[in-house]
Amino acid sequence: MKFFNREKEINEILLILEEEPNNIYFIYGPLNSGKSTLIREVITNRLDKSKYIPFFIDFRTRNILNVDNFIECLFEVDEKSKIDDFREYAKSLADLLVKGSEEISKYYLGMPIKVPKPFFDRIFSKRDKSADVYQYIEYLFAKLNEKGKKPILIFDELQMIREITLNGNRLLLWSLFQFLVALTKVQHLCHVFCLSSDSLFIEYIYGKAELKGGVDYILVDDFDKKTALKFMDFLAKQKNINLTNEDKELIYSYVGGKAKYIYDVIVKLKAVKDLKYILETKLEEERNHLEELLEKVEEDYEGINYDEVLEALKLFKDNYELPKSKIKRKIRIFLIKENILFLNPQKGTLKPQSYLVWNAIKRML
């Protein structure tokens, strides 16, 4: 599927890249709102490759239980290299990256950070591994800057390392943040973007005083109604499907502006033809999920009070968005963790993760 819209967010990111690095940027939003698709579009189609080199670290599909797993995710080992001095290797890697895009073009979104095997093995022989890791990345990025290339470091689903500690006490996440602040705000060596669908994690970051002045946020929300209807036209043309204005209004009334759901509905429409049936099926699936969750709560799931959950959900019968203070902290955290509600920490508001969830709440209650 061709990329659609998001020009506002794309232009914001491109303007950030034109300036000297000064912040860690958190790209966040509801589930399936298009965060990864957005950064993919920027990196693959909008980026001036003569100026930038993207590095992409994907925590989404990795089981990261300790610092060793983190390092394995961070680096790609050059098994053929016998170079023991990381500075020598970093210089040669920087030369390779600057001379041509052949090495980069192998990677769809951005390359991992390559290290020579002797250096990688030496890291794992030490108790405190983070110092060597950070020193190598800093040196590599400094060399790229010297050659006129600005690195872009992207972390997908960074919250996956939230609980990992260094040597049993200090959190890896805060060690990493200190390093990233040094790379951006202090040394201006690289741009950093962190993607996350976990709004509790974003709230956690947002509330940390030590990060203020060193981080900023980009919200990738579901489409507004006008954009959602245009997206339906865009897809209908691609899929050679005739959608009436009534059809589009009906789709929006069920799934709102969530691009993934709109896409799923229109793709199914090619085979099923019955739009109302498709939408009702999706809604019933969501309602069943909510009903199952409430049944577990009624049986004392995680010590959550059933009546308090019901009262919280009832607040959304006539409201799509509410101040987070309207719902007790314990209850809202539970509903956010269960992907029923989405928290916007910048506005201090809560809303259902999607129109589909909102409709399921209203239908159940």
UniProtKB/Swiss-Prot annotation:
Keywords: ATP-binding, Nucleotide-binding, Plasmid
Top-level taxon in the UniProt lineage: Archaea
SUPFAM superfamilies in alphabetical order: P-loop containing nucleoside triphosphate hydrolases
Residues at which ATP binds: G29, P30, L31, N32, S33, G34, K35, S36
Keyword Nucleotide-binding in record: yes
Keyword Nucleotide-binding: yes
GO terms for MF: ATP binding
Pfam families in alphabetical order: ATPase_2 (PF01637), MJ1010-like_2nd (PF21690)
PANTHER family, per database record: ATPASE DOMAIN-CONTAINING PROTEIN, DNA-BINDING PROTEIN-RELATED
Similarity section: Belongs to the archaeal ATPase family.
Protein's UniProt name: Uncharacterized ATP-binding protein MJECL15
